[in-house]
């Protein structure tokens, strides 16, 4: 049976998984440290090459180009992550597996996961905010991830330190 593949491409690690159905538990997962682009992507390609895929979804740190038809669609663009600027993330997977590849931000992927399988079940709209390697957010309204000009860019949130905060 051809499987569904998923990549959560984070600034610290890539989590790759395969499952039979969208709501089924993963059959296999792997955690790959996010090092240099070629090394990290090659390790992910190697993981998926052991499985027959019917589709793949990638949720990535960014900024990324989500404009289908753009010459840089599927790229991680002007990221502060060292060595990852202008990295084609989608292309290597499309070329290797010749299956449909979905692509979105890591926080939009997490927001969609919460809506369908987590704390947002039963809702049709939500905002998801994460604090991890960076700060980001994704928003869903009427069951649809918000993209384009109306996308609320939540990744540029200044955090001012309180003078009494001794956290180092």
Could you describe each region identified by the protein language model?
Residues 19, 30-32, 70, 77, ...:
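Residue-level structural signal for beta-strand termini and adjacent loop
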Residues 4-19:
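N-terminal beta1-alpha1 ligand-phosphate binding loop
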Residues 12, 61-64, 132-134:
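Short glycine-rich anion-binding loops that position phosphate/pyrophosphate groups of nucleotides
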Residues 17-20, 27-30, 37-38, 94-96, ...:
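Glycine/GP-enriched mid-protein hinge/lid loop-to-helix segment characteristic of carbohydrate kinases
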Residues 41, 64-125:
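Glycine-rich phosphate-binding loop and adjoining helix at the ATP-binding site
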Residues 22-52, 70-72:
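N-terminal phosphate-binding loop and adjacent alpha-helix
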Residues 13, 25, 71, 76, ...:
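Hydrophobic "anchor" residues
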Residues 4-8, 53-57, 102, 125-130:
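Short glycine-aspartate micro-motif
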């Amino acid at each position: 049976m051809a499987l569904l593949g998923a990549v959560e491409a984070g600034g610290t690690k890539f989590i790759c998984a395969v499952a039979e159905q969208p709501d089924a538990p993963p059959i296999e997962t792997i955690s790959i440290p996010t090092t240099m682009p070629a090394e990290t992507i090659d390790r992910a390609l190697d993981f998926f090459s052991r499985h027959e895929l019917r589709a793949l979804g990638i949720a990535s740190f960014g900024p990324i180009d989500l404009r289908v038809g753009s010459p840089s669609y599927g790229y991680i663009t002007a990221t502060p992550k060292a060595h990852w600027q202008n990295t084609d993330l989608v292309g290597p997977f499309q070329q290797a597996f010749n299956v449909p590849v979905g692509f979105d931000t890591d926080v939009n992927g997490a927001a969609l996961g919460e809506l369908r399988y987590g704390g947002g079940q039963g809702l049709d709209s939500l905002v998801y905010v994460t604090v991890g390697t960076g700060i980001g957010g994704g928003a869903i309204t009427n069951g649809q991830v918000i993209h384009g000009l109306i996308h609320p860019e939540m990744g540029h949130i200044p955090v001012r330190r309180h003078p009494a905060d001794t956290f180092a």
